[in-house]
Amino acid sequence: MTYFIIIISAIFVNNIVLSQFLGICPFLGVSKKISTGIGMTGAVTFVMVIATIVTYFIQEFILEKFGITYLQTISFILVIAALVQLVEIVLKKVSPPLYQALGVFLPLITTNCAILGVAIMTVSRDYNLIEAVIFSASSAVGFGLALITFAGIREQLDLVNVPKGMQGAPIALVVAGLLAMAFMGFAGLV
Amino acid sequence: MNQWKNFSKGFFKDNPVFVMLLGMCPTLGVTSSAINGLGMGLATTFVLVMSNIVVALVKDFIPEKVRIPSFIVIIASFVTVVEMVMQAYLPALFEALGLFIPLIVVNCLVLGRAEAFASKNTLGSSVVDGLGMGLGFSMALTMLGAVRELFGSGKIFGLSLFSESYGMLIFVLAPGAFIALGYLTAFINKVRKA
């Protein structure tokens, strides 16, 4: 039951993009087409789950054991940066088709605050390993849901006549606001 | 280079929030009130100036290939400093900003200035650039925070202007952040071009 609550909460109620404001840069940057949105979601899911598992072990067995939790920010971001590089190299070798699909998005992920944010949240909420995996995976699903829905709306938005001053970023932000309002309907679900 | 131009570009011409759309996560996440926006802006300014200084000083010693990880370590060190100082002296602000303080590390504005400016320019210009960009960022966050606070609860910096019961709660909540920033961006762009 706890797992179920974690999943629903991470995907809908506390959606990582629309209510936690993490990962806004890719949310606004790569949401012009649905296909790129799907690619980005795949890459984020992949890295987010692995990064959360690795940072979980680092927190548990290195930082807490030696009482150096103040090094959390530095160690986590370094691990994530190295991990992204590693994933890129491994994918290139092991699965060229997957690398083709996710490749361009991987370098962008180091500075995606959703990855670091989820890693820190996992630690600060004292999740165990299974909960951490479930939480990170469903956060990634929530990110994908928001990103792909938003990309779909923006594809439609290209066809309408937007007032001159609102073109580009302003109209995208207002649309994102309306989408966030729709997601607020899930509040109180868990 | 003209230092005044270098300083002032962060406010209007190349404002990090309204024009370059950098650092959107903290911009939207912490601006439920003007004071939170200002606090976040100043914390980011500190990190930005300090990392610009260090990057400008060590740029000749860092091999090209590992420059991004090195910049991230430099930035992360200053973020840790900010985190500890704030926790010790401003615990209320520390609580309010929460997760977004460690996330200054991945603020694309900070890394962006280190990579695009400080790694190519002299120490003096880098300090001025960091100050200008940081204060421009603070200005944008404070403006957004003030707008949301005013419409949401009828206050600015905690000073009550009209009764809270007339406030529109939506501006304090998540959707209001996007909508307020959207209209504010449109407004600033209009002013900038005029």
Predicted segments with their positions:
Chain A
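Cytoplasmic-side transmembrane-helix entry/capping segments in multi-pass membrane proteins
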Residues: 35-46, 70-76, 98-110, 165-171
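Interfacial loop-to-transmembrane junctions
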Residues: 155-173
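Ordered, amphipathic secondary-structure segments that act as subunit-interaction surfaces
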Residues: 60-103
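Helix-coil boundary and interhelical linker segments in multi-pass alpha-helical membrane proteins
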Residues: 1-5, 57-70, 120-131, 187-190
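Generic transmembrane alpha-helix signature in multi-pass membrane proteins
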Residues: 21-29, 88-93, 104-106, 113-126
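Structural signature of hydrophobic alpha-helical transmembrane segments
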Residues: 3-18, 66-82, 133-146
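Hydrophobic core segments of alpha-helical transmembrane domains in multi-pass membrane transport
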Residues: 6, 13, 44, 49-53, ...
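C-terminal ends of transmembrane helices
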Residues: 22-36, 84-98, 150-161
